[in-house]
Structures are given as C-alpha cells and as structure tokens.
C-alpha cells in the first residue's frame, strides 16, 4: 500500500510551528535547513512541491523578543507581520543554498471560498509549479479575522494545507508535526501507546482519541490534524501525519517506508492514477 506513494508527483508538505521553533521560542535553523535540502532535492527528482508553513507569529515573537504570543488581535497581527517577513527571509536563504527559488503565497479563508479568487489562487500555484518554483503558503495572519458575518481565518494551517492539497489536486499531503503519528492513546502519558499505521475511516471512536491544543507558539492540535485528514479523505486524497523533527523522513515516506500514520480511503490507498 505504501509502495504506491513512490509514484506521487505533486506533494503538499505542511510544517507546524512546533517543528520550526524550539520550546524556548528560538528558531530551529537546523530543521529549517534540512527541510530546504529535502524539498529542493525532491524538486531535482522531478516532484512538484508546495510548502504550507506556519511560524509567522512564533518567529515574530522571537524577533521581537516576546516571551509568549500576544492575546489581542492588533498585537498578534503586528507580530505576524514582522514574523512572516523574517520567516520568508530564512526560507529564501536556505533554499537559495540549494539553488531553489521559492515564492510567497498568503491566503485568507474568504479568498479560497469565493470562486473567482479561488481560481486565481489555483492559477498562481499552477504557474509557480510550472516554473519549478516552490510556493510557500501561509495564512495571512496580518489581515485575517474571524467575525460573525465575515470569516477570513482558516483557524489553523492544518486545514489550510488540506484546502491547498485539494486546490492543486495533490497526490499526497505530508503533515510534519511534533508527534510520530496518530495514537490509540496519549503517548506522552502512556509509554505503551500504539500508533495507527493506517486509518481508512474517521469514526466517532477515532475522533474521541484526538487531544487538545498544540504548542504555546502555535494553534494546532491533534483534533485539527484529524479535521485536515477528514477533508483530504473527502477529496479522495491521501495524508500522512508524521514527526518533522528530522525532515529527511520525507525521503522515507517517498520510498514507501512504514512511518507515520497514513489517512486514506481504502480504495485510494491502493490506487494512484492522478494526473496533472
């Protein structure tokens, strides 16, 4: 079943704040550099790659020497403004070391919900990919708000990555997190916790296993990753949740190794005939 992943041509890689940042709030440059190397090499191999990256607020907090995320919207958005600029500078530097060009794409929920602007986003991503450029997608935290009549926030980049995967008809979404996969119990409290190798259906029992919030600098948790998996499976797409501590694990996934948890409908798990 994992063997079919070798044929994946178009990939969406999602990396969370917990992977990009140390627990002390500093930027994990080692991981970011490895990620740039891996994705650049996948491009050299002929794969099409889109990176959905969190971290604007976390990097902004580091840049501004803040001990924690601000709680009010204007301060959060100001920090995101600083952080997104710094984050893209870091990415551009490391990807540039491997001769890989990247392009920034900032989205809000209303843009991908509205048909005309959604088509524009799809065309932009297709144009970038056709030129061998790796789009780096993030939510536009500087302007995104959540109001009663005008919702522009995705809520988290887990869902955003699934939406992007659907927009570009990706063959595989790889979600890099701070956990090895989806477990039957909490691995931080249960040393004997068993990890699912594959999930073919999101049942109420599976939903009940999802925990709470993520890191202190991020917004996601296991529940949001499960929501992203549900979104992917509804689109007949595959998603793998795995640990992003060492991004070279992506190479293992692309070789069909049994790492992380694969979310795929039963028939999709064995098939791979998507074309672009």
UniProtKB/Swiss-Prot annotation:
It comes from the Bacteria. Pfam families: AA_kinase. Keywords: Amino-acid biosynthesis, ATP-binding, Cytoplasm, Kinase, Nucleotide-binding, Proline biosynthesis, Transferase. Pathway: Amino-acid biosynthesis; L-proline biosynthesis; L-glutamate 5-semialdehyde from L-glutamate: step 1/2. GO terms for cellular component: cytosol. Belongs to the glutamate 5-kinase family. This is Glutamate 5-kinase. Substrate binds at residues 54, 141, 157. Its main location: cytoplasm. ATP binds at residues 14, 177-178, 219-225. Disulfide bonds: none annotated. Catalyzes the transfer of a phosphate group to glutamate to form L-glutamate 5-phosphate. It catalyses: L-glutamate + ATP = L-glutamyl 5-phosphate + ADP. PROSITE patterns: GLUTAMATE_5_KINASE (PS00902). It comes from Listeria welshimeri serovar 6b (strain ATCC 35897 / DSM 20650 / CCUG 15529 / CIP 8149 / NCTC 11857 / SLCC 5334 / V8). One of its GO terms (molecular function) is glutamate 5-kinase activity. PANTHER family: GLUTAMATE 5-KINASE, ISOPENTENYL PHOSPHATE KINASE. One of its GO terms (biological process) is L-proline biosynthetic process. HAMAP family: ProB. Its EC number is 2.7.2.11. It is found in: Cytoplasm.
